[in-house]
């Protein structure tokens, strides 16, 4: 039955705005995961960042956190301007299920140097 398939809450792109130097948390809600893997992909270069708890990027700032309510959250520590852009979480079903998060990075006003 379809009920045991993993599914994502909300197919629309989420938007997250984070200040430079702070931590970003990109949400991907997955329910009834079973034995399916959840991957986070950085769309600008197609780099697979995480699969479940495993991290596949040398950058120590990236971490996937599984929340008690079955959210898989991608944490990016000390966000930099180049982190801005689209990220996608994918569930390893056939066909795969995916949801996108758009990360916007802003500079806090008191850090401006004129």
Regions found by a protein language model. Name each.
Residues 1-24, 114:
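N-terminal edge beta-strand
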Residues 1-7, 31-63:
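N-terminal V-set
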Residues 4, 50, 81, 106-110:
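Extended interaction regions within the primary functional domain
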Residues 10, 18-20, 32, 42, ...:
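Conserved strand-loop elements at the edges of beta-sheets that form or border functional pockets
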Residues 11, 54-75:
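Extracytoplasmic beta-sandwich strand-turn segments characteristic of Greek-key/jelly-roll folds
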Residues 18-27, 33-35, 67-71, 77-89, ...:
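Solvent-exposed loop/turn motifs of extracellular immunoglobulin-like beta-sandwich domains
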Residues 39, 45-46, 86-109:
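Extracellular/luminal immunoglobulin-like beta-sandwich modules
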């Amino acid at each position: 039955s379809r009920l045991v398939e993993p599914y994502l809450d909300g197919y629309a792109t989420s938007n997250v705005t984070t200040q430079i130097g702070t931590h970003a948390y990109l949400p991907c809600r997955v329910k009834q995961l079973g034995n399916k893997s959840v991957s986070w992909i950085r769309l600008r270069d197609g780099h697979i960042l995480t699969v479940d708890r495993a991290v596949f990027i040398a950058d120590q700032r990236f971490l996937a956190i599984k929340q008690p309510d079955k959210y898989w959250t991608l944490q990016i520590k000390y966000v930099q301007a180049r982190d801005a852009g689209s990220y996608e979480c994918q569930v390893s079903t056939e066909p795969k299920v995916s949801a996108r998060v758009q990360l916007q990075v802003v500079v806090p006003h008191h850090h401006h140097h004129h």
